Amino acid sequence: MDDNEDELEEHQELVSDGSVEEEEEVEPDLGPVDSWESFNDRIDGLIFNERCDKSVKKLDERRLAILNRVRQQFREAPKGVAERCQAQKSPIDQRLELSSERLNELVRFGKELVTNVRVANERRELNRRLFEGAQKNQMHVKLQRESVETMARFENIKARWTELEETNEPMLLWDQIEEQKKRIAEIMARKDEMISACQAEVDRMNAKYEFDRERQAQDLCCLVERVDHQVETLKEAYKEHIQMLRQTIEEERQIFADNAVEKWRTFFDAMNANFDEKANLVRAREQFYARQTQQINESQEELTKSTRIRLEKECERLELELRRTRDNVLMNSEKLDYNYQVLQKRNEENVIINNQQKRRVARLHEAIGRTRRGLKNLYNTGKRNIARLSSDIYKLHSNINDMESKAHQARLNNREKFDRIWEINYKELNLLVDRVYHIDRIIHEQQLAMPWSSPVPPIPNINKAKKKRNNILEKFDMRIGRVPKNRVMPNSGVNCKPDIKELPPDSLRLMRNLIRKLSDRGGFLIEERLLKILEPYSEEEKCLVRIDNIFAALRIRHLRDVKELTKVFMPYTYCPNCQPQGLSPRKCAEVFMKDQKPNRLQGAAGGQPDEKEHRSTGDTFLPKSEVAAKRCHNHYLVMEPALCLHAMNLFTSKMHKKMYEHEPGSILNAVNLIQITDAEIRNFWRQFSACFPASKCKLWKTLEHGLNHYVEVLKMRVQYDAEVVFLRRQNEELRHLLQKFTV
């Protein structure tokens, strides 16, 4: 314990010394950085600087010294119970422990290899952030200085214009106007220089991004190679340790067999040798028991006499203790009386303490009142904070629109990057195919002495479509609920604008019933507090939303919209006179299932609308509704409340689809700007795999097989040479042993 405390004190002193040295050796501020390479050189210089790593090196050296000293103490210390148990372990257990230790070291080494790559990436990212921060600060300072100087020049020019108004001489006025033009030209030139500097910074950042991406790809390749190599190493190590464990088990089994044979042989020899001795011992034991029995009888008689005398003395002693017990009982009764009086006094003290506790409880109630008042104040402040946060939310909504425009620009940038990567891969594959053809031509002309011809003509590039930019204002119009200019409604009902009052009475009656069902089913949208407030009013006064507002919310402005709404709701209606039991649960389930299937298919296909399925569901229900309407002429149609919101959802989705569909021939406003499908891309890149026919592959495989066979022959030759050397060494050792035995 004393050694450990001394080591901890020395470690703390070393850490404190390191911190003092770090405070004393403060590095000067970084100056302006010219490029990313110079910044990396400076960072590496700081990292490998001896002054920066002085405290860290001291800590490492101190830690290693302490670790070596503790290990030396463990080696020199006498063996304890654990070491003796370790020495007594079987060879199998020792082999298992040794194998587990070595395999754990291999696994730990593999983890370190993988961790080194991650640490290098994190270090590179740290350097990049430091450099980008420095560059950003420099550019910001430069822009601020330029704006200050520009404003000063502008104020100077503005002041000179007032002086020009007072000048009456034409030549002097002309000279001063020319000077003003020169000053303005200088300001514009400085602005152009700043713009070019900013553009150069943007180009540098793009180049740095490409460089970092290539370096990251190299790190990933290195990491994959390390992992594969470590996996193969672990496989070989596990196989070797399993083989060694099998050999150890076989040796242990042979040792156990030899020990068992030797044990049984010695046992039978000892049993045959000691048989006569056991008979003699039995006769001697019988004589000894006879003598012992006689001695026990004599000693028992003497013990009985002594016990009688001892019991008489014990009886006299118990009588004396009985007298003493009576005296103690009298003393205890007097003590009980005294304790009773003491308890009465304590009871009086407890009454006083209870009164004090009651007063304390009263003070606590007062504290609770103060706490409640504080809670009320907190509630009011919370309301104010909620209002402030609501305003922040509105600001965030405006920021969302900006982010959408930025996202659109990012998609355009991704399209450009896709084109660049496509062009790079296309060029690399063409170069690779040319190299393969060149090698194949050399093989045919030089090795096989055969004429060579190109098997496949060159593959044309399919990614040559022009990029078209989408209009960002369309998304803003859709967000605020305005129909964009390039969205058109169907041409069927553009010119007709009849009034809703021209509807037949049946349609008006059905619409009134539908709106009532909607209001009944929308009760969950209203708070219970509002229902309690409206409870004392009449049914007409409870109406908070009028039909005009509902139609305005649903974008129903013409008679065709009302007819469309009626068509959507007709499949879910029934006649209460002809069908008093209402719609069957089976039909309701069919409605939900048929409407949910298109939605699931849309989600699986990536959100693309399926017009045919919506059309099919509408067509299946419309004939039934028309038949029911003809059969139940002038009947009062009703609707299930459970299907009301479902039908309204179908109507809104249908209207939204009509309002926001594109013009014929226009490109969809999709997120993906790449006009080539995945199948076309796969087919295009698969064409390169067919550039080299199967006959050429067989020829190359045949050559490879011959070379591999030659390599295997060389390996076998090396193995045979090693075996010959080993056998010669064994023969020399055996010859040496035979010479010793002959001597």
Curated annotation (Swiss-Prot):
Region feature (Disordered): 1-34, 599-620
* Coiled-coil regions, chain positions: 175-332, 395-416, 715-742
Is Coiled coil given among the entry's keywords? yes
> Compositionally biased, Acidic residues: which spans?
1-10, 19-28
Query: Its family?
Result: Belongs to the DRC1 family.
Q: Please report the organism this UniProt entry assigns to the protein.
A: Drosophila melanogaster (Fruit fly)
Q: Which PANTHER family match?
A: DYNEIN REGULATORY COMPLEX PROTEIN 1, NYD-SP28 PROTEIN
What is the name attached to this protein's record?
Answer: Dynein regulatory complex protein 1 homolog
Gene Ontology cellular-component terms listed: axonemal dynein complex; axoneme
Q: Mind listing the UniProt keywords for this protein, alphabetically?
A: Coiled coil
State the superkingdom.
Eukaryota
One biological process term from GO is: cilium-dependent cell motility
